[in-house]
A protein has these predicted regions:
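Non-catalytic cap/lid and distal C-terminal segments of serine-dependent acyl enzymes
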Residues: 1-128
Length: 128
């Protein structure tokens, strides 16, 4: 998501599984940005929620799948922050909350086909 939002027009489609969508607002991001970039403020350039607020390029719909049983959901991933920022910016985004899935292989393997279809459709390919 960050690669797309920092490089308008480079990507035709975008999707993610359980992404850290607002790292400047969570402990993982605060620690990483302060340690690697010198400040949390510098991390805004690598935060999808911050980037979508001012994005002005092409807007391919973003598909996000997130498990409701993911132990990182509420204190680290924050998909609701991204969804709200995207909606306010008029950016099409679908955040699908998947009941009982966590942050594991089974989450990805269960919904990978949907993500492949999302990209195939964006590329104008027939249904996979």
């Amino acid at each position: 998501m960050v690669a797309h939002l920092k490089n308008p027009g480079m990507f035709t489609s975008v999707s993610a599984f359980a992404p850290i969508t607002n790292p400047v607002a969570v402990p993982w991001g605060e620690k990483a940005f302060a340690g690697y970039l010198g400040s949390v403020e510098a991390g805004k350039d690598y935060d999808a929620t911050e980037l979508v607020k001012n994005y002005s390029g092409p807007k391919p719909a973003i598909l996000i799948d997130q498990g409701t049983a993911d132990g990182f959901l509420h204190n680290q991933l924050k998909p609701e922050n991204f969804a709200a920022a995207a909606a306010k910016a008029g950016y099409p985004c679908s955040v699908r909350m998947q009941p009982l899935y966590d942050h594991s292989y089974y989450m990805i393997s269960s919904f990978l086909r949907d993500h492949i279809q999302h990209h195939a459709t964006a590329l104008g390919l027939r249904n996979m």
